[in-house]
Regions:
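Bacterial N-terminal signal peptides
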Residues: 4-15
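Soluble periplasmic/extracytoplasmic beta-strand elements of cell-envelope proteins
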Residues: 45-50, 58, 74, 107, ...
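Mid-domain, small-residue-enriched loop/turn segments at the edges of structured enzyme/sensor domains
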Residues: 119-177
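A short, well-structured edge-of-sheet supersecondary motif
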Residues: 25-61, 229-230
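Boundary at the C-terminal end of the N-terminal hydrophobic targeting segment
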Residues: 14-22
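Conserved catalytic neighborhood of penicillin-recognizing serine enzymes
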Residues: 88-128, 156, 161
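Active-site SXXK
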Residues: 54, 64-94, 106, 239
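Structured C-terminal helix/loop/strand segments within mature extracytoplasmic catalytic/sensor domains
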Residues: 21-34, 64, 121, 170-199, ...
């Protein structure tokens, strides 16, 4: 049976991820971001969410991008959730090291071996994936440990171990609001992300002095950065920026972060300061 070219095109269009809608107040910021990324050689996915107002902006927000080491946020989240429910402790010894030390190595220094030790103790990638799905985090999948990921042939459009920008920001939001982990664990996570030693030419590059808690991801042809930017009044914006291909990935992340910061600052900075973080 012959299928018309029009019908095939219609099917292809329907298979594309739906565009993530930006909030009306942020359409001007969305236009700025679109103009900026149009001049870049990299393919760029962006999502940003004001954690007070709930307003969002995104570019390719529902398109999957490889997470690289940004997946370590999800690994940390599951471990901390199990600390909170009494199954584990940060003082547990795993492979001769404390979980606390492994978490620090994973998040501050992006240590791949420490990540795989924690991941194996949790039950492997599937355990993290299933926990995310059970908690309603859609659009983020965990398929391999870091060793397997590094051994695999590079494919910038591989959907394994990928996240949409919107899904990553949803995870960040729910961690920040202590919906998936308790406030004490959330604060521990933020403290480690604030000490991140990698990717200083990304989110932090054009925002000197601005508090940023983040986690980078890097593979051949990929550069990512996800985390929280603190606005002048003290409230935070959750941000995920994924880039693949091209030659200007770190600079693109730095410039994108600056545009996001300026855009949210102009609209959502609270005149009397943000509400205090729940202890």
């Amino acid at each position: 049976m012959r299928i018309s070219a029009f019908f095939l095109a219609l099917l292809a269009f329907a298979a594309q991820p739906a565009a993530a809608a930006s909030s009306p107040n942020l359409l001007s910021l969305e236009q700025q971001l679109n103009t900026m990324v149009a001049g870049k050689s990299a393919d760029v996915g962006i999502a940003a969410l004001d954690l007070n107002s709930g307003e969002t902006v995104s570019i390719k927000g529902n398109t999957p991008f490889p997470m690289a080491s940004t997946v370590k946020v999800a690994v940390a989240a599951l471990y901390l959730a199990q600390v909170d429910n009494g199954r584990r402790s940060l003082d547990d010894t795993i492979d001769g090291q404390s979980a606390r030390s492994l978490m620090r190595r994973m998040l501050v220094h992006s240590d791949n071996h420490a990540t795989d030790i924690l991941l194996a103790d949790l039950g492997g990638p599937r355990a993290v994936h299933d926990w995310l799905q059970a908690n309603g985090i859609k659009g983020l999948r965990v398929d391999r440990n870091i060793s397997d990921l590094l051994r695999s042939k590079r494919d910038l459009w591989d959907h394994r171990d990928s996240s949409t920008p919107v899904a990553m920001v949803d995870l960040l939001k729910r961690l920040y609001k202590a919906e998936l982990i308790k406030p004490e664990s959330r604060n521990f996570l933020l403290d480690l992300m604030a000490q991140c030693q990698t990717g200083r030419n990304r989110m932090k590059a054009l925002l000197p002095g601005v508090p940023i808690e983040h986690k980078t991801g890097t593979l051949d042809g990929l550069a990512d950065d996800v985390g929280f930017i603190t606005m002048p009044d003290g409230h935070r914006v959750a941000v995920a920026i994924f880039t693949r291909g091209g030659t200007d990935r770190p600079r693109t992340i730095a410039e994108t972060t600056r545009v996001i910061y300026d855009g949210f600052k102009a609209i959502f900075t609270w005149p009397f300061g943000a509400p205090a973080l729940q202890k």
